[in-house]
């Protein structure tokens, strides 16, 4: 149903132009203090979108999110202490 998606962190010179980013993907978050926007786009169009966004005059730099590539299953994690006790 849904394809693989990845977020791009787009650093801007000014937030005035943040609305223009809507046509390049779904805007998830805009930080006013740090002047960046998190834009989601399809994985297969990622390189193309980065190239198009880098051409825009109000974009400082773009970084890919590494969240899809991080391992989220941890091996030697300690069990929950509350679940150790059997209260039955």
Swiss-Prot record:
Domain of life: Bacteria
UniProt xrefs under InterPro entries: DUF2129
GO cellular component terms given for this protein: cytoplasm
UniProt-listed Pfam families: DUF2129 (PF09902)
Keywords: Cytoplasm
Compartmental location: Cytoplasm
NCBIfam families (UniProt xref): PRK02886.1 (NF002777)
Entry similarity comment: Belongs to the UPF0298 family.
HAMAP family: UPF0298
Listed name of the protein: UPF0298 protein Bcer98_2635
Organism name: Bacillus cytotoxicus (strain DSM 22905 / CIP 110041 / 391-98 / NVH 391-98)
């Amino acid at each position: 149903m849904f394809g693989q998606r990845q977020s791009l962190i787009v650093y801007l010179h000014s937030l005035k132009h943040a609305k223009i980013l809507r046509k390049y993907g779904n805007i998830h978050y805009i930080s006013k203090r740090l002047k960046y926007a998190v834009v989601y786009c399809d994985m297969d169009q990622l390189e193309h979108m980065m190239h198009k966004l880098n051409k825009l005059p109000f974009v400082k730099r773009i970084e890919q999110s590494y969240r899809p590539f991080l391992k989220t299953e941890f091996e030697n994690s300690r069990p929950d202490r509350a679940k150790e006790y059997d209260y039955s």
